[in-house]
């Protein structure tokens, strides 16, 4: 690895990938952030190709998590359950943030992952008028699973990610907002949550393959911004 890839990042960053939002915390190495983004993107594309996310949400989620595992992530916790909500005004993003906060607290004993996810979500709402965001939105508004993830690198150089996926249907509006800002349209919904830690020894062996398969898609349908 080059010295450039080992530089420690100093800013929190959010990456919009194929309609899903990935937040990466400051303090990650540039290499770790790059690897996480590509793995997240690759797993999303594989799951999208294998299953209809709206009609086969459980299979889509399982495929996504299984691909992440095959790429070198260990999965100490994963679930996919029918949830209930008494409030239909809550956004998909708010539900996902709560799930990430709870799972992150259980894993790391703090609020850092939940706070990071919330910051990324809040920042996204302020860049709604960005032409690139709007273009990205139009391409991905029909997704059946809406994902939000937060990732950090600990002082021990462990890369930890929590992913929350919520089953949702796009509103039938031309100007609908990004999926994570959709409102729940029913009191029951399916939600998947997974805690992942990166085994860099394994990912080192597949990094080149992932990057080659992504090709130009590693920059297309991806929008990154500081938070």
Model-assigned labels for residue ranges:
Residues 1-40, 44, 48-49, 61, ...:
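C-terminal assembly and membrane-engagement modules of membrane-active proteins
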Residues 74-77:
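Short juxtamembrane and helix-loop transition motifs at transmembrane-helix boundaries
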Residues 79-134:
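Membrane-inserting effector segments that mediate pore formation, membrane fusion
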Residues 64, 68, 116-117:
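Short amphipathic alpha-helical coiled-coil/interface segments
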Residues 45-52, 56-60, 65, 72:
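Long, solvent-exposed N-terminal ectodomains/accessory regions
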């Amino acid at each position: 690895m080059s010295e450039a890839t080992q530089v420690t990042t100093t800013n929190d960053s959010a990456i919009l990938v194929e309609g899903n939002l990935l937040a990466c915390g400051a303090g990650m190495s540039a290499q770790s952030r790059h690897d996480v983004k590509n793995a997240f993107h690759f797993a999303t594309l594989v799951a999208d190709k294998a299953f209809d996310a709206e009609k086969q949400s459980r299979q889509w989620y399982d495929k996504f998590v299984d691909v992440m595992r095959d790429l070198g992530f260990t999965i100490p916790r994963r679930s996919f359950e029918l949830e209930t909500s008494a409030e239909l005004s809550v956004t998909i993003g708010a539900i996902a943030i709560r799930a990430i906060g709870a799972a992150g607290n259980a894993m790391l004993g703090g609020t850092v992952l939940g706070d990071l996810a919330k910051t990324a979500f809040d920042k996204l709402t302020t860049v709604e008028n960005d032409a690139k965001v709007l273009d990205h939105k139009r391409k991905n508004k029909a997704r059946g699973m809406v994902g939000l993830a937060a990732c950090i690198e600990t002082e021990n150089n462990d890369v930890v990610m929590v992913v929350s996926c919520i089953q949702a249907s796009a509103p039938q509006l031309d100007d609908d907002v990004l999926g994570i800002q959709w409102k729940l349209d029913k009191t029951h919904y399916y939600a998947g949550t997974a805690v992942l830690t990166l085994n860099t020894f394994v990912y080192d062996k597949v990094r080149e393959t992932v990057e080659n398969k992504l090709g130009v898609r590693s920059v297309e349908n991806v929008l990154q911004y500081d938070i």
